[in-house]
Amino acid sequence: MFKIVSTSFFFLLNSFLFSQTGNVDENFKKIYNTALTKGKTYEWLEHLSNQIGGRLSGSFNAQRAVEWAREELDLLGLDSVWLQPVMVPKWVRGTFEYASIESSPGNTINVPICALGGSVATPSSGISANVIEVKDFEELERLGTNKIQGKIVFFNRPMRPDLINTFESYSKAVNQRFNGAEKAAKFGASAVIVRSMNLRLDDYPHTGSMSYGNLKLRERIPAAAISTNGAELLSSMLSLNPNLKFFLKQNCKNYPDVLSYNVIGEIRGTKDPDEVILVGGHLDSWDLGDGAHDDGAGIVQSMEVLRIFKKLKFKPKKTIRAVFFMNEENGLRGALAYANHVKKINEEHLFALESDAGGFSPRGFSFDCKSRDFKKIISWKKYFEPYMVDYFVQGGSGADIGPLKNGQVVLAGLRPDSQRYFEYHHSDNDTFEAINKRELELGAAAMTALIYLVDTFGFE
């Protein structure tokens, strides 16, 4: 009798699991078909990029982006749409920067540069000084004040081309951009120039955030990025003439903080509405280019997750919430404000997924979670394999959802192909024309599919 019951139970269990798998496969097809044949990501991104454009925190365009995002979320017929106030820094680039290499009196070559975000201006007449090239902070320390005083420090450590994951290459080079001015100022440098964070040789300078640490205002020095071609030229000319001079002029300025907003919309859960599944990206971008890949793509992909749920009449168990964070690029104020509010009201977040790596072909996801949860997640990989989204790795998520980390919530990041990303990142190159419609849509579909699985199965 026991054997018959056991056999029957095993048969029913297998039938149930097969039924679940069949439903998942069918719903994945519906999700992908909707994203690829009736998607809105490309249309949305065209407006955000071409009609609004670069949207640095505190700017008029950033406010326009907030209003646009709220209106589009309202049109989706969500259960709730609201703005979360947040004070953000305001930095203005001013007129375009100018730089030149002077090999001898009267002989100059112009090179492409851009001020780093948060940098102070040069004097109105600019700065002209000798240049000292370094690869890292250790070399800077060895040279000391005697050799650096009054000179322009040129940080010229390239991103490593031998690393397959270009974000790893970026992480090993970006400290010279972020901390270079602070380090060089302590040795009396008059300014810093940093090689752009770009694996390709081209004429586009790439901006990005930087910090002066605890330096007093009078101790701060101008900081600018030089294009990779410009860096190669300057380095080769220095090897021939160490006494050449570099001229730099920029009139950027920091202003007092201003009011801005995170934009939030959600579909309330039917069973556990107090448990939140978050999907999002950052609404702000740098002022160069249109911010199409960074991070307009993540914004419209997150919007598409909600739209597909509504279109397919999926009734989520948990609350599915999209958050468009403000000020990721130069402060993370939006992320911190959101996380602090969540903590204050003791709101439970089950899962958070961020898209902030460009609108390229999705390859998979990274997960910041416990091994127990990752074991469950890895069992879902089979559903993604037919769509060639099979890179599942434990470790890492996203900057804006990072402050939510509490040991319980599972954090994740969409991982698209990264090989071209840093050609566009933080530069005039990051425009709508650099977006591939199908790749953008595939990313949105993969995100929607993962959110669907988390809502359907959870992590228990």
What are these regions (language model features)?
Residues 28-36, 50-60, 97, 118, ...:
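Second-shell loop/turn segments in exported
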Residues 25-27, 102-105, 113-145, 212-292, ...:
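Soluble metallo-hydrolase cores and metallopeptidase-like ectodomains found primarily
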Residues 23-59, 96, 204-208, 212, ...:
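N-terminal capping segment at the start of a domain
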